[in-house]
């Protein structure tokens, strides 16, 4: 992204990242695709794609006509490129900030976030960008900390869901997919 300054966001890996990646590939993503009826042949963007673990799975299960990953960390994107090659997956990889994405308006039918948004300062700006690049009728799937939600369900819903509405997104449905740490939700653009 020329002309913009990328800020390094604090990243704390999951305590058992290898185990998490295995669960994500074998169970979480397939369950998510089925539960939310993610469309085949669409345009999919993963924000905060990191090492690109989810991209081959999304490619295999959804057969998108466009698949892209965005991450702020160039080193992780190099690992993602290696991972894509190993799996024979074709996807665009972009270095950039979710708060200022290098994509045209309404460029994606599905945007997925497997735990990036809650690490970002000024997440309202990120939601503005997500709403901008999400096509009408598209789906935004994001992961939140379930422990926060379960401790304070009313406060959590009151804080996050109006923020989605402010950005032209409405809650479509949500599903508890991750038993202990996180929760997946989906919002659709109007």
Short names for language-model regions:
Residues 1-39, 41-50, 53-57, 141-168:
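Conserved class I S-adenosyl-L-methionine
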Residues 43, 138-139:
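Short glycine-centered segments of the SAM/dcSAM-binding site in methyltransferase folds
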Residues 99-110:
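A short acidic, Gly/Pro-enriched loop at the edge of an enzyme's catalytic core
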Residues 110-122:
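A short SAM/SAH-binding and catalytic strip from SAM-dependent methyltransferases
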């Amino acid at each position: 992204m020329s002309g913009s300054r990328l800020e390094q966001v604090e990243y704390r890996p999951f305590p058992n990242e290898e185990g998490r990646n295995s669960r994500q590939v074998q169970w979480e993503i397939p369950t998510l695709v089925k539960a939310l009826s993610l469309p085949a042949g669409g345009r999919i963007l993963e924000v905060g794609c990191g090492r690109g673990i989810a991209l081959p799975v999304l490619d295999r299960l959804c057969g998108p006509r466009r698949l892209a990953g965005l991450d702020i960390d160039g080193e992780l994107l190099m690992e993602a490129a290696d991972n894509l090659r190993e799996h024979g997956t074709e996807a665009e990889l972009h270095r950039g900030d979710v708060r200022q994405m290098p994509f045209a308006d309404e460029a994606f039918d599905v945007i997925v976030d497997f735990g990036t948004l809650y690490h970002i300062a000024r997440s309202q700006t990120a939601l503005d960008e997500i709403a901008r690049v999400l096509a009408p009728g598209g789906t935004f799937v994001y992961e939140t900390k379930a422990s926060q939600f379960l401790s304070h369900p009313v406060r959590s819903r009151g804080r996050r869901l109006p923020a989605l509405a402010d950005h032209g997104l409405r809650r479509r449905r949500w599903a508890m997919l991750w038993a202990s740490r996180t929760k997946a939700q989906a919002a659709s653009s109007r």
